[in-house]
Amino acid sequence: MGPRALLVLLVATAWHAQGVPVIQPSGPELVVEPGTTVTLRCVGNGSVEWDGPISPHWNLDLDPPSSILTTNNATFQNTGTYHCTEPGNPQGGNATIHLYVKDPARPWKVLAQEVTVLEGQDALLPCLLTDPALEAGVSLVRVRGRPVLRQTNYSFSPWHGFTIHKAKFIENHVYQCSARVDGRTVTSMGIWLKVQKDISGPATLTLEPAELVRIQGEAAQIVCSASNIDVNFDVSLRHGDTKLTISQQSDFHDNRYQKVLTLNLDHVSFQDAGNYSCTATNAWGNHSASMVFRVVESAYLNLTSEQSLLQEVTVGEKVDLQVKVEAYPGLESFNWTYLGPFSDYQDKLDFVTIKDTYRYTSTLSLPRLKRSEAGRYSFLARNAGGQNALTFELTLRYPPEVRVTMTLINGSDTLLCEASGYPQPSVTWVQCRSHTDRCDESAGLVLEDSHSEVLSQVPFHEVIVHSLLAIGTLEHNRTYECRAFNSVGNSSQTFWPISIGAHTQLPDELLFTPVLLTCMSIMALLLLLLLLLLYKYKQKPKYQVRWKIIESYEGNSYTFIDPTQLPYNEKWEFPRNNLQFGKTLGAGAFGKVVEATAFGLGKEDAVLKVAVKMLKSTAHADEKEALMSELKIMSHLGQHENIVNLLGACTHGGPVLVITEYCCYGDLLNFLRRQAEAMLGPSLSVGQDPEAGAGYKNIHLEKKYVRRDSDFSSQGVDTYVEMRPVSTSSSNDSFSEEDLGKEDGRPLELRDLLHFSSQVAQGMAFLASKNCIHRDVAARNVLLTSGRVAKIGDFGLARDIMNDSNYIVKGNARLPVKWMAPESIFDCVYTVQSDVWSYGILLWEIFSLGLNPYPGILVNSKFYKLVKDGYQMAQPAFAPKNIYSIMQACWALEPTRRPTFQQICSLLQKQAQEDRRVPNYTNLPSSSSSSSSSSSSCRTGSGGGSSSEPEEESSSEHLACCEQGDIAQPLLQPNNYQFC
């Protein structure tokens, strides 16, 4: 047996073992040099076939069960993938081998120079590498060496070429395959990639105008425009069956190709009238639109109505009178007019007119019709061709009215019944025994007057009829009733004949029986109770918006804008479904503030932590209106870095929600007190619950604390309502002491206090520039966010002012008296200057590290006298002299002598610059120095500053203040309430 036969036998044996054709030489790839003889043998169980780049240079030798491909001079053109299949094998299967003919002069074999795909499909650029060793240095470039677009996503296979994945229309270019050969770049011939738009529908088509009317001789224009995502589409304009030859304008706009046909007619004639159709054709199909062009001899104005011109409507109902107008040229004027007959009806008629090219529809609405609105209503229209009118006659139907009188006719007693109404009423008489206001169904019919005398029948007025009933001799204890009715309703009136001899009177003692007296007493008691409850309700404080916006002023007389009249911009509306609520940050008498996560606020993928204000479910309508007013004021003011800014709102589909910035470090007052406790120690700091975190919540707890009015410890009931998280457990706080450790752990420096003061002043200057008065400037209403940035807010909603002794009852409101200017306390005058006074109190809070203003002084008549006489608090322990001078300027009794917030900002900026130049002011005093400062402050007394009282009396008061520091007593006394 020869070697060749043995080889065939071995290959056949291997194929039977595998069940698929086998190619020799084995292996997925074969690399040869140019000019080499290449032999590919495929062996199967039956006849086999070759598939691949088989050119005439290949010789095919069939030797079943094998097939042999041979070429004596291999070139780079023979590079490619060759497949061997066995058609007769039911199991299918094929064998594959890839042939490389590595030609250094031709590293690429390009199978096609043009590739067309739909947008979004993968595009294969068939440039095959002839040498697998060059794969590391291949790349894809655009023609003339330009790089591919940055967004082009492609991959490379040496067997197949480059594949651009999900080709885009913008990637329509000529590409070249590039390889590094012996240090130089060799590119293939160009391959034009054509990316076509996926035509999923017809071209967009517009034919304007939709309807056209012209007078003979006028000019006209018809525009047919079409747009398509691909340039391969046509557009045509036809008049009837005739295709018009019109020059076409092309453009590319908004990623669409546009083609426009414009027909201009300078002098139209009747031959130009008719149907015009515009057709656009693309790969998907045709799309057509048509219009009608009418040519008329002259202008016209036609008025019609689908309603009857004679209208009858029941009084109290609504009617709409509608007129349809066809006019060319368009209407110059039109109006509805009431033509009478009731001259006292002068109300402005409410009508709506809708225009549609050459047609108008005007509708006059008459709601809840009154009798005086009956009459003629005329619609009058005018255009260049003249004028025309259409008149409706409106008659009102209403039930009868009856009046019965008695008269003598021919010496006989006669009852006269006058009935008026529309339509004409019919009259019947009945009588019943005894005196009664109305006869029942058992009453006997006396007369059915079907021929009542018509006294008056005027158009648009009621019809008045008379009916007479002769009763002869009067009978005592009998009632006569006249009944009138029409299609709308009925009415009646009774008449009692009075007999002089039959008159009787009840005894006086029967008028006030014990039962009657008891009922009257109970009614009086209930009335008193109702009045008492009403008084208590009126005295109950209501949730009000503290912020006010000035509309105008004259002297000290201010006119404020009604916030309910401010517009609400729907741009603030935010889907309530995109809010994920967390814990309650604060809860007060009227509502609460809840932590929430807002999804898509500002940007679609944004996730932002926010604070959401909402009312309690038991809120009254005026409180809901107040929250809506607060929302309108915040949106009216706009944004500023140093106010708690509005982020959005939910006003539809549920309770009103106001979305504001979330300030993670809570209010400034608690922040200062935490810092004071950390710096000075518990014995010298203000009271603070160790479990209380920084937040918004009002918690009223009875606990041990350090007295805030001085620097001495005491025990009692803490009545300051702090803003803290709902849960006092540190494990449940999202912002616990551990979370705030980094921020709180940084030592509090003088520059921090100056920054707080300056930031609040900048926020107040912004509010003043917007003519806005805050009316509750205090450290508790200032929040701190990351970076120790102070933001002004108003948290009356989430503060339990019912139990906060800082708010004193005056009238039916609770007011922060210790922070209020004299003119606000005594004259109820609130201005920007009164906010400046409150800002001075806020400065005192900041530089005393959170002490309560006017320490040791109760809010009573003596306190009011001190304020009126110009009493000022002493310089705080940590305030530089210049800062205390600003406080004193803010506390000037004459409002006009107080500085503006802009001036305060300048003064604080100057002080901050001095602080940077003087190192001694960088850090606040230590515990020892603070202690001495506190003692010094006590010796100086709370009465530092100007006072009109004698010095001796003031000194005794200061000494008494210091003596009180040694006595354990509540921080704020329970009798801090003053009624206006």
Swiss-Prot record:
Its EC number is 2.7.10.1. Residues 723-743, 918-959 are annotated as: Disordered. Its main location: membrane. One of its GO terms (cellular component) is cell surface. It is an enzyme of class 2 (transferase). Residues 536-980 are cytoplasmic. The modification Phosphotyrosine is found at Y543, Y558, Y696, Y705, Y720, Y807, Y921, Y977. Residues 926-940 have a biased composition (Low complexity). The keyword Coiled coil does not apply. It is a single-pass type I membrane protein. Keywords: ATP-binding, Cell membrane, Disulfide bond, Glycoprotein, Immunity, Immunoglobulin domain, Inflammatory response, Innate immunity, Kinase, Membrane, Nucleotide-binding, Phosphoprotein, Proto-oncogene, Receptor, Repeat, Signal, Transferase, Transmembrane, Transmembrane helix, Tyrosine-protein kinase, Ubl conjugation. Disulfide bonds join C42-C84, C127-C177, C224-C278, C417-C482. ATP binds at L585, G586, A587, G588, A589, F590, G591, K592, V593, K613. InterPro entries: CSF-1_receptor, Ig-like_dom, Ig-like_dom_sf, Ig-like_fold, Ig_sub, Ig_sub2, Immunoglobulin_dom, Kinase-like_dom_sf. Present in an inactive conformation in the absence of bound ligand. CSF1 or IL34 binding leads to dimerization and activation by autophosphorylation on tyrosine residues. Coiled coil: none annotated. PROSITE patterns: IG_LIKE (PS50835), PROTEIN_KINASE_ATP (PS00107), PROTEIN_KINASE_DOM (PS50011), PROTEIN_KINASE_TYR (PS00109), RECEPTOR_TYR_KIN_III (PS00240). Residues 794-816 are annotated as: Activation loop. GO terms for biological process: cell migration; cell surface receptor protein tyrosine kinase signaling pathway; cellular response to cytokine stimulus; cellular response to macrophage colony-stimulating factor stimulus; inflammatory response; innate immune response; osteoclast differentiation; peptidyl-tyrosine phosphorylation. It is found in: Cell membrane. The juxtamembrane domain functions as autoinhibitory region. Phosphorylation of tyrosine residues in this region leads to a conformation change and activation of the kinase. The activation loop plays an important role in the regulation of kinase activity. Phosphorylation of tyrosine residues in this region leads to a conformation change and activation of the kinase. PANTHER family: MACROPHAGE COLONY-STIMULATING FACTOR 1 RECEPTOR (PTHR24416:SF47), TYROSINE-PROTEIN KINASE RECEPTOR (PTHR24416). Tyrosine-protein kinase that acts as a cell-surface receptor for CSF1 and IL34 and plays an essential role in the regulation of survival, proliferation and differentiation of hematopoietic precursor cells, especially mononuclear phagocytes, such as macrophages and monocytes. Promotes the release of pro-inflammatory chemokines in response to IL34 and CSF1, and thereby plays an important role in innate immunity and in inflammatory processes. This is Macrophage colony-stimulating factor 1 receptor.
